[in-house]
Amino acid sequence: GFFPFFFKSYWAADLSPTESTFVIGTASSLVGLFIAISAPVLGALADAGNVKKKFLFAFAAIGIVSTGYLFFVPESSWKLAITIYGLGVIGFSGGNIFYDALIISVSKPEDRNKTSSLGFSLGYLGGGLLFFLNVMMYLYPGWFGFNSPIDAVLWSFLSVSVWWFVFSMPLFYAISE
């Protein structure tokens, strides 16, 4: 995605390349450690009762809001940007734990591999299409009414947030636990 290079050139432009690499690497490591420690607990919670959709919604909301909020983070605000990014990764990763746990609610045992593969592939296809659109926005900002590639990247974060929200709604409304 756009975050690493945009972080360095826009939000952390006042840091040296070494410092910005250190910041993003450290933050990613800390978020990864948090996820590694919390994932087994969250997985057990998902297996314990009918809370999968509630927690999926909560984590998705964290990710959706965080991703969209990146649009509003001002230039040179690297501390805020990296914090919001970390929350977004936690929202995405935590949501995936509960999303994966829902497979037993939406599919018969003999269909779970097919259902999981279909969901996985459609998710990546949709995400890939949006990423392609976002890359085109970056490469040709004028085509999309943007003044600069910077505006295009900022709008890309907002578009990902909206996309995530829109394509999460069918799950929240149509799938029962």
Each predicted region: which residue ranges?
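Membrane-embedded alpha-helical bundles of multi-pass transporters/translocases
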Residues: G1-S176
